[in-house]
Amino acid sequence: MCPATVLDSILKGVRADVAAREACISLSEIKAAAAAAPAPLDAMAALREPGIGVIAEVKRASPSVGSLATIADPAKLAQAYEDGGARIISVLTEERRFNGSLDDLDAVRAAVSVPVLRKDFVVQPYQIHEARAHGADMLLLIVAALDQSALMSMLDRTESLGMIALVEVRTEQEADRALKAGAKVIGVNARDLMTLEVDRDCFSRIAPGLPSNVIRIAESGVRGPADLLAYAGAGADAVLVGEGLVKSGDPRAAVADLVTAGTHPSCPKPAR
């Protein structure tokens, strides 16, 4: 029997938390709330804007580091990100290892006019309707957390609700699975969720094998404009940044620096 990985531990907690929420609000009730929510914003259009986009993340903690920042007002932080030029705001909602919550998602959705990504470990259809009910326009699906049948089903359900799925991969094999499932937006995570180790070369190995019509997002490992430019040179359409922003003294300026680099004439252009 293989030893449990970090991802296994996270998923076990997520399943328990989803079951607890569903015991309070049924699947039929959350579906009704999702249907009654305002229509989702066009996250795909935001990702296709010229230059390298910045997805800025509201992130309180991580399994690898622990607490990252005390975020007293997630809405204020999200507004700073938007003011800095972020195209999409990502909100971590996993409770046990990332200290996130749906309350953070609600606060951010009410505060910004750009699309919002719910970043969590989706293992049940309930979470997809829950994301839409709380105003998400985009949803993370992690290939390593789902078998192929579940991945395809979750992707179809996400798109049926008008959201865009950010399908996260770590290996060439996972990228193949994402493509076979029909992913239109693929994120390559430099951090291995099994071990929490970071490999910034992961993106440059996987991105060349992705079709040009697929949006490519580099996740993790962005510490500043130099990293954004390196990812752009490897074919990124956008970068997702969390830790570097929440730990900066001026998140608006930190986002603006990345946006400036991503839209500068010397920045490599996405191959579309």
From Swiss-Prot:
<dbReference type="InterPro" id="IPR013785">
    <property type="entry name" value="Aldolase_TIM"/>
</dbReference>
<keyword id="KW-0057">Aromatic amino acid biosynthesis</keyword>
<dbReference type="GO" id="GO:0004425">
    <property type="term" value="F:indole-3-glycerol-phosphate synthase activity"/>
</dbReference>
<dbReference type="GO" id="GO:0000162">
    <property type="term" value="P:L-tryptophan biosynthetic process"/>
</dbReference>
<dbReference type="Pfam" id="PF00218">
    <property type="entry name" value="IGPS"/>
</dbReference>
<dbReference type="GO" id="GO:0004640">
    <property type="term" value="F:phosphoribosylanthranilate isomerase activity"/>
</dbReference>
<dbReference type="InterPro" id="IPR045186">
    <property type="entry name" value="Indole-3-glycerol_P_synth"/>
</dbReference>
<keyword id="KW-0822">Tryptophan biosynthesis</keyword>
<keyword id="KW-0456">Lyase</keyword>
<keyword id="KW-0028">Amino-acid biosynthesis</keyword>
<dbReference type="InterPro" id="IPR001468">
    <property type="entry name" value="Indole-3-GlycerolPSynthase_CS"/>
</dbReference>
<protein>
    <recommendedName>
        <fullName>Indole-3-glycerol phosphate synthase</fullName>
        <ecNumber>4.1.1.48</ecNumber>
    </recommendedName>
</protein>
<comment type="similarity">
    <text>Belongs to the TrpC family.</text>
</comment>
<comment type="pathway">
    <text>Amino-acid biosynthesis; L-tryptophan biosynthesis; L-tryptophan from chorismate: step 4/5.</text>
</comment>
<dbReference type="InterPro" id="IPR011060">
    <property type="entry name" value="RibuloseP-bd_barrel"/>
</dbReference>
<keyword id="KW-0210">Decarboxylase</keyword>
<dbReference type="InterPro" id="IPR013798">
    <property type="entry name" value="Indole-3-glycerol_P_synth_dom"/>
</dbReference>
